[in-house]
Amino acid sequence: MSVLKKPDLTDPVLLEKLAQNMGHNYYGEPAWPNDLLYTFPVVILGTLACVVGLAVLDPAMVGEPANPFATPLEILPEWYLYPAFQILRVVPNKLLGILLQTAIPLGLMLVPFIENINKFQNPFRRPIAMAVFLFGTLVTLWMGVAATLPIDKFFTLGLF
């Protein structure tokens, strides 16, 4: 037989907390099973219904339709592959381009070992990791934009 501690309902501190609904959600129901089994599926299915409904009723054109009788001047990959495409396009040796793309994740795996700081610390107090992140983001965006331009405008992005 388990022994449960009964709350002292004459304690003024406890009565003040109960008056402010502390320890309970606003409508007084527990999160399990009510929220997790009933509310979340309704929200998820409602969101899914909205997305599917919009996709069926108002489809967005992703680009111009393909013409099997005309080859485009320059064939580009999908937008998320632009930086990798730009590396292969700029580096003269294709093997060197593949090795460069392999070296990027390997270099990122070394960053935590370079900076010997508590992993639970604020990310803004890790200057090396923040510098690597910001530099990598800028270079990736730069290469992604440059992949859509001619090769002679790669470094300046056509601005100068």
From Swiss-Prot:
<dbReference type="Pfam" id="PF00032">
    <property type="entry name" value="Cytochrom_B_C"/>
</dbReference>
<feature type="transmembrane region" description="Helical">
    <location>
        <begin position="95"/>
        <end position="115"/>
    </location>
</feature>
<comment type="function">
    <text>Component of the cytochrome b6-f complex, which mediates electron transfer between photosystem II (PSII) and photosystem I (PSI), cyclic electron flow around PSI, and state transitions.</text>
</comment>
<feature type="transmembrane region" description="Helical">
    <location>
        <begin position="36"/>
        <end position="56"/>
    </location>
</feature>
<keyword id="KW-0793">Thylakoid</keyword>
<keyword id="KW-1133">Transmembrane helix</keyword>
<keyword id="KW-0602">Photosynthesis</keyword>
<feature type="transmembrane region" description="Helical">
    <location>
        <begin position="127"/>
        <end position="147"/>
    </location>
</feature>
<comment type="subunit">
    <text>The 4 large subunits of the cytochrome b6-f complex are cytochrome b6, subunit IV (17 kDa polypeptide, PetD), cytochrome f and the Rieske protein, while the 4 small subunits are PetG, PetL, PetM and PetN. The complex functions as a dimer.</text>
</comment>
<dbReference type="InterPro" id="IPR036150">
    <property type="entry name" value="Cyt_b/b6_C_sf"/>
</dbReference>
<comment type="similarity">
    <text>Belongs to the cytochrome b family. PetD subfamily.</text>
</comment>
<keyword id="KW-0472">Membrane</keyword>
<dbReference type="GO" id="GO:0031676">
    <property type="term" value="C:plasma membrane-derived thylakoid membrane"/>
</dbReference>
<dbReference type="GO" id="GO:0045158">
    <property type="term" value="F:electron transporter, transferring electrons within cytochrome b6/f complex of photosystem II activity"/>
</dbReference>
<dbReference type="InterPro" id="IPR048260">
    <property type="entry name" value="Cytochrome_b_C_euk/bac"/>
</dbReference>
<dbReference type="GO" id="GO:0009767">
    <property type="term" value="P:photosynthetic electron transport chain"/>
</dbReference>
<protein>
    <recommendedName>
        <fullName>Cytochrome b6-f complex subunit 4</fullName>
    </recommendedName>
</protein>
<dbReference type="InterPro" id="IPR005870">
    <property type="entry name" value="Cyt_b6/f_cplx_suIV"/>
</dbReference>
<dbReference type="InterPro" id="IPR005798">
    <property type="entry name" value="Cyt_b/b6_C"/>
</dbReference>
<keyword id="KW-0812">Transmembrane</keyword>
<dbReference type="GO" id="GO:0016491">
    <property type="term" value="F:oxidoreductase activity"/>
</dbReference>
<keyword id="KW-0813">Transport</keyword>
<dbReference type="GO" id="GO:0045156">
    <property type="term" value="F:electron transporter, transferring electrons within the cyclic electron transport pathway of photosynthesis activity"/>
</dbReference>
<keyword id="KW-0249">Electron transport</keyword>
